[in-house]
Amino acid sequence: MTSLDEPSQDWPACTLSYRHFHLLWTLPVCGVLLVIARPFLTKLDRAKLILLPIIAFVWTTPWDNLIVRNRAWSYHRHCIWFTIGYVPIEEYFYFIIQSLISTLWCTLITRWTLPNLYLTPSTPARRPLAPFAVATCVVCFVLGLQASVPATHTYYFGMISWWSSMPLALLLWGSIDFVRNMGVGAGFIPFAISVLGPTLYLWSSDIYALRRGTWHINQATSLNIFPIPDLPIEEMLFFLVTNVILVSACFTFDRCVAICRLSAPDHQPPLSPSYLPLGSLATYTKLWAAFVRSDRSSLPTSCASASVEPQDLSASLQVLRAASKSFNAASLLLPWDLRTDLGCLYAFCRVADDLVDDHAQELQAKAKNLDVVRDIVDAVYADSIVDRKQHLSTPIGERLRILLASAALSDKIKQDTRAAATSIAPLTQYIPKRLWYEMLQGYSADLRFQHQDARQRTRLQSMDDLVEYSQCVAGVVGEMCIRVILGRCGSTVPLDLEVDRKIALRASKTIEQSINVKPLDLNRTADVHTLLYEARRMGVSLQLVNIARDVVPDSVELRRCYLPADMFDKEEDDGMYEALLKGRVALPRHASKLVHGAEEQGVVRPQDVRKYALRLLEISQRLYDESYPSLRQIPNRPARAGLKAACSVYAAIGKRIQAQTEDEISSGRRARMSNLDRILRAISAVYFDV
């Protein structure tokens, strides 16, 4: 431990010790950021939070000791605890805490973007920025070395210049063109906010500490330029460049992992925010190979992930944004790799549903569209239409373009369908084709509500029939989502593992108690089956909420009734089931037509149907309460956060149905949640698990 110089008369008196400075300024904000970010931290984020502080500590320690040794800054003895070398122990903590603050802040700012959308090779006409950035850093390095002469006014400035230029040259070479490819909204603005947020905060804390004598900048080794009162330009530069280094490192990590995810062989789990084994040497070799890869290089076309072009991913996710604002908002809480996968999965489900259930088309046209969707699934899985070898040699996008060329669809629908179908191609290694066929059975059931042959019409007679239908259109989606999440986390579920489709309400809290007491071991097939089974139950639960909300609109607009016939009270409401199937609901806007048409006898009121919707909600709530604890078993914290928020927000629609006013009930309006209610429900689910 080295003794410190005695303070001169020019130093301000120390009224704030270094450790109290940490307690007042750095630790609280670090703690707050950690609490906010913790539910969303991926394995990639954790890698940043581990590696970047370590690298910063190793790189800064000798430089900082040299700075203090040459008296560029100094400390009062009684304001520090002790020194290691020439530097107070609190200063070493500062290296780590600042790295954590900046990395956490950058994570919160940039987590909303999808880096895999911006890996398109740069065109020759677009000059790369990396050589210019590296050349600038080299010049700063040379000038900094020349200026860093001890006991001169340029010393501190020069030391910062050469010390920061080396890591900046390396990191900007690996990230600056990637940031430019992301554009202004997704790249430069988040980059700037990520840098300026911590920088402005640390400038403020530095002024506070300097005014209270926590540390002192030597005027003999400073330029003595103060752009902000009491804050030397060297201190401003130090915090600015260190945050640029940290943010550049974060963007570089994102770029490297995005490349690794898209270029991994199909038989290996790709590196991603959800799968990043830091204990494996192969991880670092793959990251380095991605780092040195030129932005002008194309990704290998042999990989299923790389066969999906970024513009198709973008178009698919745009379909999701237009089709389901609720799911799109909830998906923002997922890590970007799972947001891509599950977003594309849901987008294809919506595209397929729109194709099959287009209200403007006749039944025969809808049936043909159902066959088109089935052919699309076959093409994605390379099983039919043409020889398998030809399938594998033809890009999936081209295959689908040929398939859709003869379909009687508009160009816009063809484009959206091809983009959505192309984007699910990487998921074929996790999702068995039979699950898509199961979903198509549900779509077929929707079509048969209006079948000309009465014997083939869809009629849900019992609760078992309703559960079977809900399994096809929602339970299967729950299983798909869990299969994708587990696969992306490195625990691929066998494609031949079939899940029990029978839904049974159990004794209160039985499932919650069993899951809480005995965590699932996802290396055991039986426990994987349990998780998939509960995912299906959750899907059925949410589908029942959807049915309860839309009883009247489904009847009036689609001539459908998803409430099972045996749910209706035979004595009180005989004929209500058939009335709903025929759309004979007395709504204010067209009730007079029904009366004057002499059909008043068979007309039902929304108030009369409501009790059956509430009964369905009771069943849905029990299923939800039993299956919700299973979400805690998902081996991915941010995936848990996103799915809990999505399920909680959707299930809360049931509460909104129960709280509808008499006017809303009689008018047959759908129950809707405000954006504020959605946000509050999501926060409660993510942070308080309720």
Curated annotation (Swiss-Prot):
GO terms for cellular component: membrane. It is found in: Membrane. It comes from Mycosarcoma maydis. Its EC number is 5.5.1.19, 2.5.1.32. Pathway: Carotenoid biosynthesis; beta-carotene biosynthesis; Carotenoid biosynthesis; phytoene biosynthesis; all-trans-phytoene from geranylgeranyl diphosphate: step 1/1. This is Bifunctional lycopene cyclase/phytoene synthase. InterPro entries: Isoprenoid_synthase_dom_sf, Lycopene_cyclase_dom, Squ/phyt_synthse, Squalene/phytoene_synthase_CS. Residues 262-686 are annotated as: Phytoene synthase. Bifunctional enzyme that catalyzes the reactions from geranylgeranyl diphosphate to phytoene (phytoene synthase) and lycopene to beta-carotene via the intermediate gamma-carotene (lycopene cyclase). Residues 1-255 are annotated as: Lycopene beta-cyclase. The keyword Metal-binding does not apply. Its main location: membrane. Keywords: Carotenoid biosynthesis, Isomerase, Membrane, Multifunctional enzyme, Transferase, Transmembrane, Transmembrane helix. It catalyses: all-trans-lycopene = gamma-carotene; gamma-carotene = all-trans-beta-carotene; 2 (2E,6E,10E)-geranylgeranyl diphosphate = 15-cis-phytoene + 2 diphosphate. In the N-terminal section; belongs to the lycopene beta-cyclase family. One of its GO terms (molecular function) is lycopene beta cyclase activity. It is a multi-pass membrane protein. GO terms for biological process: carotenoid biosynthetic process. The chain crosses the membrane at residues 21-41, 48-68, 92-114, 129-149, 156-176, 183-203, 231-251. It comes from the Eukaryota. PANTHER family: BIFUNCTIONAL LYCOPENE CYCLASE/PHYTOENE SYNTHASE.
